[in-house]
Amino acid sequence: MNFNEILYGVAYYDEYMPYDRIETDFKMIRDAGMNVIRIAESTWSTWEPEEGVFDFTHLHRMLDCAAKYELNVIVGTPTYAIPSWLAKKYPDILAVTHNGKELYGHRQNMDITNPDYLHHAQIIIEKLMEQVKDYDCVIGFQLDNETKPYDTCSKYAQAKFVEYLKNEFPDIDEFNREFGLDYWSNRVDDWDAFPDIRGTINMSLDAEYKKFQRKLVTDFFAWQADIVKKYKRDDQFITHNFDFEWHDYSYGMQPEVNQYEAAKCMDIAGCDIYHPSQSSLSGREITACGNIARGIKGDNYLVLETEAAGNHPWLPYPGQLRLQAISHIANGACMVEYWHWHSIHNAIESYWKGVLSHDLRPNRLYKECSVIGNELKKYGHRLVNLKKTNKFAVIADNASLTGLNEFKLNNESDSNYNTVFRWLCDALYLMNICLLYTSPSPRD
């Protein structure tokens, strides 16, 4: 997929603002040379405060103002953080995991196989799409947000797992032999008596369940994409902000998602890349994670989230924002988008700083963003859709990752697949050797 210009912008939340300043914000965004915002993905309860009662006031304010200031918009489906009324009416929606039953409050606490969740998620996606489909400024759609299976072990998930195993192993004796289930009397001779997967001591069977959980994510994306495709125009794209294994920052391959398979229903891969800054800014995370993103579909990608200031010690030194933006673009990104425009005034991410601080006034970061944005207005058409010719490829896959993590290199060490993966990537990065990461399975 090709673009005419580099997309440069921010995530924006009118619904989080302490007071009305949307005109001021969008003028500042435009004046900074930014040309895109992402909206809507986090606030299902704002769009549907009660079951069947919808209020898209903030959505239309953002879309109307974006059109006025000639900003492109990416709309996210708001299904990763469920409203309280949904959890109260259908408590089974809250996931059952290896650690027990989830409580309401934090995000991504639901069972993505639960039929009541899927029913209501489809309703809010369709209602949202009906609201945005006629806006020319909407250029694309982000499916959900940093999706994973959330370790769902619900009755629905486990029933699906048994059906998955029956399809993979029509002969139950073959299944028992393949996984060595005579050990400790773990043998299963009746599919209807299949034990709760959370109790297994068989690492191979546990690895198979993790593979199945990754398939749940792939199926979830395909399901959402089919809904969105009923409304999207031919000139609009579908993407997702894939994330990475987290070591206080984006580190390596995401163990819980087969990103190669999950992205097949999308037009372009997207990702979220967060990394240390100041004296710890090395470029390694931007390169390693960007290479993973580029390998998902073997093409350019979108950085749907990266930090402007971000975590407490990450306030960038002067010039680092520009260095970071150019690094993303040089690695094949067609978009660089900050999470987020304004620092949030309450809740858990209050001090994950945006472009603007809590006083919402122009600052050093805003001025540096303005330099980047206005440079990209001049030269972005020459930098977009950059291709890299790689002499080396690294085959990286979830099956190897899961296997190595299940059967550890050293029980006294925290080293895992991604640790070894990064040793290799970082060494080659320091040697200025460009890599492509690819799946062991050929692409369609």
Q: Locations of the language-model features?
A:
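Short, well-ordered coil/turn segments that N-cap beta-strands
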Residues: 4-6, 33-35, 67-73, 134-139, ...
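Short, solvent-exposed turn/loop segments enriched in Gly/Ser/Thr/Pro and often Arg
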Residues: 13-15, 40-43, 76-85, 139-148, ...
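Aromatic-lined substrate-binding rim segments of carbohydrate-active enzymes
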Residues: 24-30, 39-96, 225-231
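Polysaccharide-binding and catalytic clefts of secreted carbohydrate-active enzymes
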Residues: 98-268, 272-279, 283-285
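N-terminal carbohydrate-binding accessory modules
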Residues: 1-36, 382
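The substrate-binding groove and active-site-proximal loops of carbohydrate-active enzymes
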Residues: 8-17, 43-57, 103-120, 147-150, ...
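Carbohydrate-binding surfaces of carbohydrate-active enzymes
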Residues: 191-194, 222, 230, 234, ...
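Short, acidic/polar
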Residues: 17-29, 250-261, 318-325
